[in-house]
Amino acid sequence: MRYSQYFIPTVKETPSDAEVISHKLMLRAGMIRKLAAGIYNYLPFGLRSIRKVEAIVREEMNRAGAIELLMPAVQPAELWKESGRWEFYGKELLRFNDRKDAEFCMGPTHEEVITDLIRKEVRSYRQLPINLYQIQGKFRDEIRPRFGLMRGREFIMKDAYSFDVNEAGADVSYEKMYKAYRRIFERCGLKFRAVEADTGTIGGNYSHEFMVLADSGEDAIVSCSACEYAANMEKAETRKGEGIEHADPRPMEHVSTPGQKSIEDVAAFLGVQNTQVVKTLVLVADGEPVVALIRGDYDLNEIKLKNHLGCAELEMAEDDVVVKVTGAPTGYAGPVGLAAKVKVVADLSLEGMHNFVTGANAADTHLKNVNIGRDFSVSGFVDIRNVVIGDACPRCDSGKLEIWRGIEVGHVFKLGTKYSKALKATFLDADGKEQTIFMGCYGIGVGRTVAACIEQNHDENGIIFPIPIAPFQCIISSLSVKEDEVKAASESIYQELLEAGIEVLLDDRDERPGFKFKDADLIGIPLRIVVGAKALAEGKVELKERRSGEVEVLPIAEAIAKVKAAVKEALQV
């Protein structure tokens, strides 16, 4: 491809609305352009990288025995109502009515559609197992689309669905996909980790996320210092801790705390540690208020609480709800003498804790020496907090938990019979008895994988693409396009590389060398051959590796051979 005939609209200045480095560089390198919030045009240069990831995904899916199909982006509401997700999925599901007033949605995922297909076509155990996948555009109406392709509303996704006769078969399918995902991300040149994860709106029994390690990652990843335990923050488990205060219960007393609302302020005012203060949080679960109690130095994990309650929607209560439940303004809520009868859930950190401080459900007032059981009751002690660095590992006795940042690029789910039961997807077994199909589903964010790669592979000059997903593998910077010798040599090298199957971009623009070098660094093509009059007079060219910055002046044939060898090595499967 000749640069002068290609479309790579690079820009020198960083766009003001771009926050993370991948968003900034994808805009500057002419890979994407914003159309609307969370919706992007994939420009030719960016699309080449997208297609590289898709090709790797297809090869590994096919190798694992999955079969490609394509399903509609528009889905009828009745399928989602049948599965129970029409209301559960929430506002991220973009719903609309057609001209006949029939309800539809733009598919953010395809569990209902694929299950409907299978229930109509599969009759016998002889037709199972089967694994079907597609690579297709999805739409999720994110409340805060941001970070470019990291959290868009419209995105490209590979989703696969496995169907088995029993749980043992489903486990085999899950393991095949797990291994295929590891191969995919290894081939893309990514540093990643597979971690236990919450199943979220997809549901099911068990899941793993594949997280690309990056300081800019939205997600927190938890791992053990001594064993293989790893999970995302939503899923990471805590152990029951020791009670902070073991003294016998003391008489509860009201104390005046004028203007003291935060945990830190209250603790300092009363001369106690944050660990001796209990937060009383009022939330609304499916329209009903609920109270969560947690130690003052910890943060509530809303996903854990939501899963415990089994609700579809969970959010912090507005001030008027807090007043209705507690009888006091926000900042002074406590579990003793609540104005309304609500469910009270306590974190494990409170089990065995005595003589702690809480709000008194009255303005400018707190309670000291509060004790569970004597002063109020809870529905149970549940793990509803975020882990912190140094927590004991829930799986081994010696390890401590560490926290990293990561970007989710893939997710595998063991669904069990969640969708097949709801949609009545069954088969006849060898004895002629009707059985429910066991399912799994497996997703990869294709555009997000490219963005995550850039987050992990860049420097101050621009992108550093790994060869397997680089839009081009080599760029030829022809420095003096008006000099016949330079032009001819550049053309000869270009043709030889093309004939060898190398994806090469010939920069034949009539621009200054520095301008071309800056563009080459920005767009991140892994290998660069520089053809200039001075070196060419000796039959040589300059070969530069983008990642290491290493520069060699070599005979033309040797430079070409090195490019071929580097590409061949990088693409070995």
Swiss-Prot record:
It comes from the Bacteria. Its EC number is 6.1.1.15. Its main location: cytoplasm. It is found in: Cytoplasm. The keyword Electron transport does not apply. The keyword Translocase does not apply. This is Proline--tRNA ligase. The gene is proS.
